[in-house]
Amino acid sequence: VALRSAKLAKKNPREIAQIIVDHLPENDLVQSVEIAGPGFINIRLKPTALQSVVAAVRAEKGDFGKGEIPEGERKINLEYISANPTGPMHAGHGRWAALGDATARVMRHAGYDVYEEFYINDHGTQMDNFGESVAVRYQQLLGRDVEMPEACYAGAYVKDIAQAIIDEDGDKWLDADPTERMENFRERAYAYELAEQHRVTERFGTTFDCWFSERSLYEPDENGESAVDRSLAAMDEKGYIYVEDGATWFKSSAFGDEKDRVLIKANGEMTYFMSDVAYHYNKMERGFDHLINIWGADHHGYIARCEAMLAAWGWPGALEIMLGQLVNLFRDGEAVRMSKRTGEMITFEELIDEVGVDATRYLMLAKSSDQPIDFDIEVAKKKDASNPVYYVQYAHARICSILGKAASEADAAAAESGELSMDELAAKVIPADVDLAPLAHESELALMRKMDDFGPLVAQAARDRAAFRLTHYAQDLAALFHSFYTNCHVIGEEAALRDARPALGDAARIVL
């Protein structure tokens, strides 16, 4: 504060800092206030102020650090992953899954009302191409000499779907009408891939409030109008639709876009952007006040036109885009692009299979979404401090081991039964009225200070859409616990600390 005010006040920063210190009210929780360096103000709290954090964490447990809905924030729609249902999700989708899910969790903990949505891109020629791809593989597997068209999908998974159809229907479709066959295979292949997306995201611990089908945007409601119709009418009513050379255009340049955008081509075909327009209008129709989309950085060029459409309807600023950079996979420092099993791009699930859900989640959140991630598969599997995931997990496991050992000394039969949760074990070890006053070692104070930072950190991470800060925080908290464990005897200490130190460890476990 002093440094920022110096230029405006035309005073030396230390002089301003002294004025601030002289006017600070007395506070029983403050141990000392010092001016340091060019004008920093260091406020050191008394141990009793920090000790109350331990009691708060242990009392509130999973609710510790929760906030209330920030003023002005209401219902938020968070859309992420939204992978095409034409093939397996790749490792990059794993980053969007981790980022979207963590962002939603952090925002909810901070008090925001967040609704998670997966947009299913199930409309357009890509779906027909998918159906045709399966039809070609189906014929090839049954001995027909048929070439795969250039626009089709050639992955091994297409062959698997075709084989599943053969197992179910045999050669029933071999001489069927090509269009009928393609449409049948398209729907079956679509259902298969959509089910796979559900299964893999659920395995990853990511659940959506809604899986929204792009097709539904073109389906009429009880009044005979589709979301496409309604979104166009709303834009036209505002005067931002015009027809030129037979095509229907959106006057997006009126809102800062570099040029106007075609919504309906002269031949009557809807553009991909038309779906975007209808989809975002539909979101606002459903009562959302703020929209957050997580996109890959390659979609950067779509931001201006999408912001323009919300502004055209009278909702400027309602759309927020989080852009995510690429995931670069490595194995022992060497770039990896292909799966050993399939010879194709490594899928999201293959990554989970190899390193686990926890490691994948954590490492995908190791950096801000606007920075590329170098994900080393071998490092993610290591059981040492070089693996940040293991380092944090080891701190948690260490605490659980301490509580388990202490519980065994208190009630061996109950502790060894395996029926008690960690909260129940902790309750057996630590008295409800535990005296925390003896916690005064610098390692203990540092650990408590870090736990006290949790609530404000969650609020900041939610506000800035910066879930990655929580992985950094977990790393720091784990390091402070390891230091505390090294410098302070947790079990077998004198009576004054026998209960207090396990209580501190238990609080660190809950926050971790």
Functional labels for PLM-detected ranges:
Residues 1-51, 58-512:
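Non-catalytic interaction-recognition regions
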